[in-house]
């Protein structure tokens, strides 16, 4: 079992935060391009009848559910961001926890990317559309959230052992009572 190794190095902070900012900037840049090149235009076919770029102003969540619930999404996003910052603060820069940090970078960048849209546009710009399966239109931030969530489940199901998860629990919730065995 590893111990909390103390402060994260400057390099660690730079990799995490610059990585997150780069992902966020990529998301915002693609949305900017979608607004300029796709808005009020016919969809652009990338692969005929399979995949196209189609502008959509999504005022809901994934798949367009919960339309017009901006306050709800803002509050949920703020709560989620608090959780990410808490995890970042509590977990050590231990190599074993790097997959958690990568997951957090993806989830943070995706959540903030769509949060920015909701705050400044009152909708989220979506533009990727898989026609072949009529999949709901999505964006780069949605890809980050999906990949981050998938990585989270893969890591916690196939990589981490019970001891690792228990140690993370102790690091994240230090006020939690110990059981009768002192664990």
Go through each PLM region and give its residues.
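Alpha-helical transmembrane bundles and membrane-interface segments of multipass inner-membrane proteins
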Residues: 1-183
């Amino acid at each position: 079992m590893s111990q909390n190794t103390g402060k994260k190095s400057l390099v660690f902070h730079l990799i995490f935060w610059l990585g997150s900012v780069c992902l966020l900037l990529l998301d915002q840049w693609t949305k900017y391009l979608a607004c300029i090149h796709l808005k009020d235009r016919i969809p652009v076919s990338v692969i005929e009848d399979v995949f196209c770029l189609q502008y959509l102003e999504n005022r809901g969540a994934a798949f367009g559910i919960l339309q017009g619930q901006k306050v709800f999404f803002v509050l949920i996003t703020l709560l989620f961001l608090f959780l990410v910052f808490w995890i970042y603060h509590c977990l050590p820069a231990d190599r074993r926890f790097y997959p958690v940090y990568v997951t957090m970078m993806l989830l943070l960048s995706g959540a903030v990317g769509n949060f920015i849209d909701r705050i400044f546009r009152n909708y989220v710009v979506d533009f990727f559309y898989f026609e072949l399966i009529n999949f709901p239109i999505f964006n780069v931030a949605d890809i980050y959230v999906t990949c981050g969530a998938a990585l989270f489940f893969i890591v916690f199901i196939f990589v981490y052992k019970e001891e690792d998860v228990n140690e993370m629990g102790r690091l994240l919730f230090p006020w939690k009572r110990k059981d009768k065995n002192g664990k």
